Amino acid sequence: MSIEANYILGAIAIGIGASLLMDLWNLFLKRTFSIPSLNYCLLGRWLRHMPGGTFRHASITAAPQKPFECTVGWIAHYTIGVVFALVFVVLASGDWLARPTLLPALLYGIGTVVFPFFIMQPSFGLGIAASRTPKPMQAKLRAL
């Protein structure tokens, strides 16, 4: 099965746009309500520890820092956005690109919280769905 070039270009635009929108929303929350922003350096630290065989941490913040972890984290954040968008476009058979509607994109976007809830947060030492954080409900709502 080949993926058409316009699917890929559409997914790149959607993925970057969605990631940028998420970053702007987090910036708004930080400046308006003093809610701490997501730290993509920690994502980079997690990824940079993987080649050494470490996939889970008791506390990602206590894990030794790695060179270029912030750069890796930010690149990964946008790459993950593009990959999620590409999966969405493929699942929608590309029809959604020709006639985009909010509901399928919104439902898919909500579904993507499975990744941070059940993979990233437990691997960072934060528990399933941020259950080991001081404010787990706030963390869950921010993931949406």
Predicted segments — roles?
Residues 1-144:
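Juxtamembrane/disordered regions of integral membrane proteins
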